[in-house]
Amino acid sequence: MDITLLLTALILGIVEGLTEFLPVSSTGHLIILGDLLGYNDEASKVFKIVIQLAAILAVCWDYRERLIKVAVGVPSDRSAQRFVGLLLLGFLPAAVLGFLFHSTIKNVLFNPLVVATALVVGGLIILYVEKRAYHPRVTSVDEMRWGDALKVGFAQALAMIPGTSRSGATIMGGLIFGLSRKTAAEFSFFLAIPTMLAATVYDVYKNWTLLRVEDLPVFAVGFVASFFAAMWAVKSFIRFISNHTFVVFAWYRIVFGIVVLATWQFDLVSWSTP
């Protein structure tokens, strides 16, 4: 087994886990790093599905008590039914757009230059949102209205553009629509479960012929790295936003995006282009 490939899997797994639930775009980071590390062949498509699944399972594990309570209560508990309804409503816009444009978006927009541009634009939007007067109307997911979930769902649909960040779009959308920081972040985490599971199932369906037994050790390394990195990131992020704004993530996005664009402009790196 190629040690370099295993190390690449470890790096990408950690990056996926750390960035999946932060407003910095995990997909964008994987596209850029995959291109930089030369891991963008057919097998890499399946690998990215595997490490994304690991991140989903990590957030399920972190919130297992809440999720089990909801699952058990769905048949008879109105609050559990309402919670599931909020998630399904928030999931709907991305589901429809993903079904219609999934292949087009992946074929046309999944390249480092689009990602870098989206990182910068998204960072500027975060700075704008943070400068607005902030008076949260909703302080827990249970207080959310149906309209809140749908509006956050439309914000999530914007994140189909790589580099935008699904969590960034949903959290910033939540803040704009009156959710508290913690509520916006937690709803973003919960909303990730049906959204990412659906995307994972669809990607597996489209790419299952690319699965090879010899790739399993690489996938296993990436899966484990992503799972534990995501577990740590989710807990740390919730603690962080209790006392901080998202400005640091905005500047990180802007600087990272500008660096990638500069390396392309001055031919320092041969990035893949459409």
Curated annotation (Swiss-Prot):
InterPro entries: UppP (IPR003824). The keyword Ribonucleoprotein does not apply. It is found in: Cell inner membrane. The chain crosses the membrane at residues 3-23, 43-63, 83-103, 108-128, 157-177, 184-204, 218-238, 246-266. It catalyses: di-trans,octa-cis-undecaprenyl diphosphate + H2O = di-trans,octa-cis-undecaprenyl phosphate + phosphate + H(+). It is an enzyme of class 3 (hydrolase). The keyword Cell wall biogenesis/degradation applies. Its EC number is 3.6.1.27. It is a multi-pass membrane protein. One of its GO terms (cellular component) is plasma membrane. Signal peptide: none annotated. Catalyzes the dephosphorylation of undecaprenyl diphosphate (UPP). Confers resistance to bacitracin. It comes from Azoarcus sp. (strain BH72). Belongs to the UppP family. It holds the Pfam family BacA. Bacitracin is thought to be involved in the inhibition of peptidoglycan synthesis by sequestering undecaprenyl diphosphate, thereby reducing the pool of lipid carrier available. GO terms for biological process: cell wall organization; peptidoglycan biosynthetic process; regulation of cell shape; response to antibiotic. This is Undecaprenyl-diphosphatase. Keywords: Antibiotic resistance, Cell inner membrane, Cell membrane, Cell shape, Cell wall biogenesis/degradation, Hydrolase, Membrane, Peptidoglycan synthesis, Transmembrane, Transmembrane helix. GO terms for molecular function: undecaprenyl-diphosphatase activity.
